[in-house]
Amino acid sequence: MALPEFSMRQLLEAGVHFGHQTQRWNPRMGPFIYGARNGIHIMDLTQTVPMLDQALQAIRDTVAKGGSILFVGTKRQAQQPIADAAEKCAQYYMNHRWLGGTLTNWQTVSQSINRLKAIDEQSERGFEGLTKKERLGMERDQGKLQASLGGIREMGGRPDLIFVIDVKKEALAVAEANKLGIPVVAVVDTNCAPDGIDYIIPGNDDASRAISLYCDLAARAALDGMSAQLGAAGVDLGAMEEAPVEEAVAAEAPAEEAQA
């Protein structure tokens, strides 16, 4: 595998260049704005392209060194793409609501994760020994904990990098990462400040197509990092029983060509 490729045309078709209304802009994003059209700021994609590439390289390198990525996006249109991307590359995500202290107070959060795991174990046994009322209470707690913590239940500790959609909405996540020195890759729209973002991706953080594109590219970069990590360890990713689908297919293709 290689770092995922993308074109300016793809970015244009996904609407990455569309910012917010000009009166809602943040002057700190001025250097990344090309101009305005019909009262809407237009992003300078000649800057977005190399900056997105640098961000993907950071994701790839983090995973290649054995690090973990936390995908963060809790706005409605980001929730599914964030979860899909993280699951695709065996990383972690938070897409329901950012819980204060997720990074800075991991010990407390891990206690909640342990409670979720304990309830899951009881659920597998049919909540035996509990009354109907107690079972309903457990199921309610299970649903809430799964929504909030399901994406990080196997993370085991703080991530090595976070990938964020909408830095204004996820300001708390960015602040916690900054406090701990965890690098931040983030899509930054024209109404946001790029402060505290290590790898800025100037772009539309509202359009579903744009969000899906960012998430897909980030997942593919992480998969490339995983491939590099396993390759360095002498592991044939395609031969692994639990290998991600993309790698398994890529590994089988040369064999099929050889038989042809």
Swiss-Prot record:
One of its GO terms (biological process) is translation. GO terms for molecular function: structural constituent of ribosome. Keywords: Ribonucleoprotein, Ribosomal protein. One of its GO terms (cellular component) is cytosolic small ribosomal subunit. InterPro entries: Ribosomal_uS2, Ribosomal_uS2_bac/mit/plastid, Ribosomal_uS2_CS, Ribosomal_uS2_flav_dom_sf. It comes from the Bacteria. Belongs to the universal ribosomal protein uS2 family. This is Small ribosomal subunit protein uS2. It comes from Roseobacter denitrificans (strain ATCC 33942 / OCh 114) (Erythrobacter sp. (strain OCh 114)). The gene is rpsB.
